[in-house]
């Protein structure tokens, strides 16, 4: 197995010692490591201390390290699909790019599932199809949001007339992406170490709010004396509880 960071040998010894499959040990270790590293983005890499570019780069590098540790060269599938989708976003008409991106990404993911069905049937080992499913959600949501914003921008006069006549904002969109992200923003989003392995899906706008440190300042709680620390505690509590459920579920599967 590809071992660019010299950790596979350690996990192989640990697997022999515990009797647990190496891919399961690696996955649990990576998830726990990601949880322990995440708070540094609120301390050492706080938006007031680190630039958005630095936060993107660190998150991207960690994502690549974690994914390559778990999946080895299979990580190239994720990079290939992301790159193809980025080229589509840059070259295809924005009014049609959402459907083309959906077809391409789902087709590639389906081929990966079919490959596993025919050549690795009844295999319970973890593979790159998990992160690929998360990637398909990210790529298609990005393409559809880009299309929606450009379509509404193109028909802004019609939308304004409709609002004036009916008193509603039926064409209002929640996420505003009017141009294709830069390469750093795109790959930083796709390979974010917190969502790369098993999700959850985070929309591009939400990711950029986190990168720029706007996720707490923009979404303030109601004026009830709550502070940012309260928000952070709630987020961390929910995050750890969800990850703990995932780890416990995986452990139960290993014991069955």
Predicted feature descriptions by range:
Residues 1-256:
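Membrane-embedded transmembrane alpha-helical bundles that form the catalytic cores
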């Amino acid at each position: 197995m590809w071992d660019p960071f010299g950790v596979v040998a350690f996990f192989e010894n640990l697997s022999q010692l515990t009797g647990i499959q190496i891919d399961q040990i690696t996955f649990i270790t990576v998830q726990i490591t990601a949880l322990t590293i995440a708070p540094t983005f609120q301390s050492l890499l706080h938006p007031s201390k680190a630039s958005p570019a630095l936060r993107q780069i660190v998150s991207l590098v960690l994502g690549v390290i974690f994914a390559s540790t778990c999946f080895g060269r299979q990580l190239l599938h994720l990079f290939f699909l992301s790159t193809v989708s980025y080229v589509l976003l840059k070259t295809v008409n924005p009014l049609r790019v959402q459907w083309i991106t959906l077809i391409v990404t789902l087709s590639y993911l389906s081929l990966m599932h079919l490959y596993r069905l025919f050549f690795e049937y009844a295999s319970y080992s973890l593979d790159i199809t998990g992160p690929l499913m998360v990637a398909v959600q990210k790529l298609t949501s990005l393409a559809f949001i880009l299309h929606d914003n450009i379509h509404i921008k193109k028909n802004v006069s019609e939308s304004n007339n409709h609002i004036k006549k009916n008193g509603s904002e039926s064409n209002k969109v929640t996420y505003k992406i009017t141009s294709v992200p830069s390469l750093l923003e795109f790959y930083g989003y796709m390979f974010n170490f917190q969502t790369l392995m098993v999700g959850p899906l985070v929309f591009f706008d939400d990711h950029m709010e986190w990168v720029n440190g706007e996720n707490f300042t923009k979404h303030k709680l109601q004026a009830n004396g709550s502070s940012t620390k309260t928000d952070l505690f709630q987020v961390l509590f929910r995050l750890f509880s969800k990850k703990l459920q995932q780890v416990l579920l995986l452990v139960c599967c290993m014991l069955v």
